[in-house]
Amino acid sequence: MTDAQPVFAALADPTRRALFERLSAQGPASASSLARELPITRQAISKHLAVLDDAGLVERRSAGREVEYRASPRALGEVTTWMERVGADWEERLGKLRRAVED
């Protein structure tokens, strides 16, 4: 497996999924603006954004005195590649099983 584990771990949390979906759908935002939109504190949002950043799911950019976060779905490519490979392996196994049962 590629290093998709941090992505899976980051997206396992519903708050982080909501943050990633928000940034993906509506574009960049600061932790302060996200705190006004979501029912959690700015400090909690900052911690969640740090996990998403470590997983490569968001990018940080200074915007004056604030840090702006934007979705960076590149890390999802590794996960997609891994899932496609695992899916193909299972399709092959199930095909062999189907042929064995039919024979």
Identify the residue ranges that each predicted region occupies.
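Alpha-helical residues within the helix-turn-helix
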Residues: 36, 47, 53-54
